[in-house]
A protein has these predicted regions:
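N-terminal cap/lid segment of alpha/beta-hydrolase-fold proteins
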Residues: 2-42
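Short, surface-exposed "cap/lid" segments of acyl-processing enzymes
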Residues: 40-81
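Alpha/beta-hydrolase active-site loop
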Residues: 94-114, 133
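Gly/Ala-rich beta-loop-alpha elbow adjacent to hydrolase catalytic centers
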Residues: 123-131
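Acidic catalytic loop of the alpha/beta-hydrolase fold
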Residues: 153, 176-181, 207-208
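Short beta-strand/loop motif that positions the catalytic acidic residue
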Residues: 165-167, 171-174, 178, 202
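Catalytic histidine neighborhood in serine/cysteine hydrolases
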Residues: 192-209
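Catalytic histidine-centered segment of alpha/beta-hydrolase-like enzymes
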Residues: 205-220
Length: 238
């Protein structure tokens, strides 16, 4: 998958949190480069966001990841982002989604040590598949958000046989022109997931939540709105 240009200036965000570099997050492959958007001391949850495939330039600075972070941070939650093994300054080598699941678990362990509160997970594309696999069934994770969940990508196997064990509330958001998530295939994947669950289609959006020829302009704000609305309904965040 080729990523849309995704680098954003970190300090342009409008959320009240501060951004801190994390130096003590380590997985089986070594140190993982990470950023924490700090939250309120009394925040009921912490949040973790995972990035898309590095072969297309995916990092924790990806636009979709950044906007998901903003949605979560708007409720005062501390939000952790990190680069998978072999990406940016993270040690190790890319492992096609296998070792990356251990990276997610290492991030959950770090959050458990530092926050002592339940976690909400969000991931985009490759990051959604890897993160859902790692988080499903983990009692520390109380909510799951899959953004641009990939169900058809040439040369990669994105299977979802694990979904039946994902019993916590789930939100899936895809563009109705997602080139890696055809509607009929994505709806079949969604059917495998148990309730509670919600699937939202963003009209005129592609895989990266950018616009189409018939509906130009990025749809990232719409994606953010859907995340916020769901968090308010499911978790009572305000």
């Amino acid at each position: 998958m080729t990523q849309a240009p995704d680098k954003l200036e970190e300090m342009t965000q409008t959320t009240p949190s501060q951004i801190r570099s994390i130096d003590d997050l380590r997985g089986p492959a070594g140190r993982l480069e990470a950023l924490l958007n700090t939250g309120r001391d009394d925040a009921p949850y912490a949040a973790l966001v995972c990035h898309p495939h590095p072969s297309g330039g995916g990092t924790m600075h990806n636009k979709v990841v950044y906007h998901a972070m903003k949605a979560l941070s708007s409720f005062g939650l501390p939000v952790l982002r990190f680069n998978f093994r072999g990406v940016g300054l993270s040690e190790g080598e890319h492992d096609e989604g296998f070792g990356e699941q251990d990276d997610v678990k290492a991030a959950l362990n770090w959050m458990e040590r530092n926050f002592h509160r339940p976690v909400l997970f969000a991931g985009f594309s490759f990051g959604s598949n890897v993160g859902l696999r790692a988080c499903c069934g983990d009692p520390r994770v109380k909510g799951l958000i899959g953004l641009g969940v990939p169900v058809r990508a040439e040369g990669r196997d994105y299977s979802y046989g694990f979904l039946p064990k994902c019993t916590v509330p789930k939100l899936f958001i895809s563009g109705d022109h997602d080139q890696y998530g055809p509607r009929n295939v994505m709806e079949g994947v969604f059917e495998r997931a148990p309730e509670p669950k919600r699937l939202v289609w963003i009209a005129g959006a592609d895989h990266f939540f950018q616009g189409t020829a018939d509906s130009p302009g990025a749809k990232l704000d719409l994606m953010q709105q859907e995340i916020r609305s769901w968090l308010q309904r499911e978790f009572g965040l305000s």
